[in-house]
């Protein structure tokens, strides 16, 4: 997460090569920062800096490859295992898909529905970013891409809050947004209490949270981050919130 924040910091300082290096390292360390390439590309496009965008992407790819290629060549099975797991896994803890299944709402062909939904949401985000009155800083919009990645995924791991919160903090524009921020954090606390009580049932404990309660806590968590994200996006759309033309 530190390397991701450094990539965002240097990008907004217009130190694109340094940012590209850190983003490449970030993607190599944990794959999720790859979703930042969408808002980055939109910012370059809106700023008419297409050549800089290609250079940025090349820099990030070089440093990603410098870390990944040697490992892939020497320990391919271990390197590929992460990608294989995410391709083959079904609906898992924390995801909206798992919550719906607990509520007896079955989603057929999840391996098709999940990527299609993700594509639709990312296309929607791209349209939103292109229609903003002014071009925002990366710090203001990085969270949006990560929220799509985490909430639409087949798993919503507990550690995702460690990824989302720093990006949420740097995206805050005014004190009024703190209301929805703390509401979201309250739903996260509720979820983290709920999942351990739900997992207790798997160990034949005499206490625990029923599946329906855990499903509601899961959906409440997604609702919390969605409301916060909506507030940020709404405020950013106001003409007076632009960063640059």
Regions found by a protein language model. Name each.
Residues 1-81, 110-245:
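Multi-pass membrane glycosyltransferase architecture that uses lipid-linked
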Residues 81-106, 217-218:
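Luminal/periplasmic active-site loops of membrane-embedded glycosylation enzymes
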């Amino acid at each position: 997460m530190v390397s991701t924040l450094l990539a965002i910091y240097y990008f907004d300082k217009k130190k694109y090569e340094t940012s590209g290096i850190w983003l490449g390292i970030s993607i190599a360390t944990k794959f999720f920062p790859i979703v930042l390439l969408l808002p980055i590309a939109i910012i370059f496009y809106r700023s008419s800096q297409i050549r800089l965008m290609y250079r940025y992407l090349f820099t990030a790819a070089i440093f990603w490859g410098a870390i990944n290629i040697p490992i892939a060549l020497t320990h391919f099975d271990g390197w590929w295992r992460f990608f294989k797991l995410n391709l083959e896994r079904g609906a898992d803890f924390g995801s909206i898909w798992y919550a719906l299944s607990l509520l007896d709402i079955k989603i057929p062909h999840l391996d098709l529905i999940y990527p299609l939904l993700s594509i639709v949401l990312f296309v929607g985000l791209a349209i939103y970013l292109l229609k903003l009155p002014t071009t925002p800083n990366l710090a203001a919009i990085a969270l949006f891409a990560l929220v799509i990645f985490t909430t639409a995924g087949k798993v919503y791991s507990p550690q995702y809050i460690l990824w989302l919160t720093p990006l949420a903090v740097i995206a805050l524009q005014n004190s009024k947004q703190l209301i929805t921020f703390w509401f979201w954090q309250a739903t996260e606390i509720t979820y983290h209490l709920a999942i351990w009580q739900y997992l207790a049932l798997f160990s034949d404990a005499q206490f625990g949270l029923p599946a329906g309660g855990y499903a509601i806590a899961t959906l409440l968590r997604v609702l919390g981050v969605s409301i916060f994200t909506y507030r940020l996006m709404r405020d950013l759309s106001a003409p007076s919130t632009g960063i640059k033309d």
